[in-house]
Amino acid sequence: MKKETDKLVSIAVLKARTGMREQLRRELLKLIAPTRREPGNLDYVLFELQEEPGTFYMREAFVNQAALDSHCQTDYFQAFAAKAEALLAEPLQLIFMEEVSLP
């Protein structure tokens, strides 16, 4: 069972609304630098699905649940969240993973 002090690794799946691919991409890229500066952030990398342009995956890792919660309360993440409904074809999906091998 996962403890609140355990490292959190996840993939966020974000699918752009029709015609919003570039705007979504720009908004996601704005999150990278400030998130990487957060003391609890371990990894934050954006990918786009080759076979499905406009479907983005954000690989992210935080030292614990509190660090992820803190990230979600930042001004820049809240600014993105306020725009998300207009940009996304469906709600953001956050998939949590358990690390099996050493990095």
Please tell me what each predicted stretch does.
Residues 1-6, 46-52, 82-103:
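Glycine-rich beta-strand-turn "strand-cap" elements at beta-sheet edges
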Residues 4-38, 42:
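N-terminal first-folded block
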Residues 8-15, 45-72:
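Short, well-ordered beta-strand segments in beta-rich or mixed alpha/beta enzyme
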Residues 30, 36-42, 61-95:
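An amphipathic, aromatic/His-enriched active-site/gating alpha helix that lines ligand/cofactor pockets
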Residues 5, 26, 42, 47, ...:
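Intrinsic disorder/low-complexity signal
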Residues 19-21, 51, 67, 101-102:
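Generic "edge-of-domain/loop-turn" microfeature
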Residues 21, 25, 55, 74-77:
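Short, structured helix-loop boundary elements
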